From Swiss-Prot:
GO terms for molecular function: structural constituent of ribosome. It comes from Saccharomyces cerevisiae (strain ATCC 204508 / S288c) (Baker's yeast). The lineage of its organism: Eukaryota, Fungi, Dikarya, Ascomycota, Saccharomycotina. Component of the ribosome, a large ribonucleoprotein complex responsible for the synthesis of proteins in the cell. The small ribosomal subunit (SSU) binds messenger RNAs (mRNAs) and translates the encoded message by selecting cognate aminoacyl-transfer RNA (tRNA) molecules. The large subunit (LSU) contains the ribosomal catalytic site termed the peptidyl transferase center (PTC), which catalyzes the formation of peptide bonds, thereby polymerizing the amino acids delivered by tRNAs into a polypeptide chain. This is Small ribosomal subunit protein eS17A. Pfam families: Ribosomal_S17e. NCBIfam families: PRK01151.1.
Length: 136
């Protein structure tokens, strides 16, 4: 079983990341020295725990957004994703020979919105193909 991290360690690490994200790295030793310079931490053991959890969170941030932590770069990235507009519209009739191929649900949605689009309804099976071979 792993060790339990206290609320103090988690709060301190999140605060460090939100304020000093550009200075932090994926290296524990570097983060430990940075914790020493930035914060006044009572004990060496607590400093090491905070630096370790900070390093752990930095590795998670590299993979994707982490719940409870927001910093400027992450906010900008989220904003860009929200403002994304595809180059080619899914409703562009010139690319699909004047008819859109949709399933039953999408067809109902288009009708409820009151859009007058030429639709071709395609039956979609409820089950997807298995990605892997079934174990015997």
């Amino acid at each position: 079983m792993g060790r339990v991290r206290t609320k103090t360690v988690k709060r301190a690490s999140k605060a460090l990341i939100e304020r000093y994200y550009p200075k932090l790295t994926l290296d524990f030793q570097t983060n430990k020295r940075l914790c020493d310079e930035i914060a006044t931490i009572q004990s060496k053991r607590l400093r090491n725990k905070i630096a370790g959890y900070t390093t752990h969170l930095m590795k998670r941030i590299q993979k994707g957004p982490v719940r409870g932590i927001s910093f400027k770069l992450q906010e900008e990235e989220r904003e860009r994703k929200d403002q994304y507009v595809p180059e080619v519209s899914a409703l562009d009739l010139s690319r699909s020979n004047g008819v859109l191929n949709v399933d039953n649900q999408t067809s109902d949605l288009v009708k409820s919105l009151g859009l007058k689009l030429p639709l071709s309804v395609i039956n979609v099976s409820a089950q997807r193909d298995r990605r892997y071979r079934k174990r015997v």
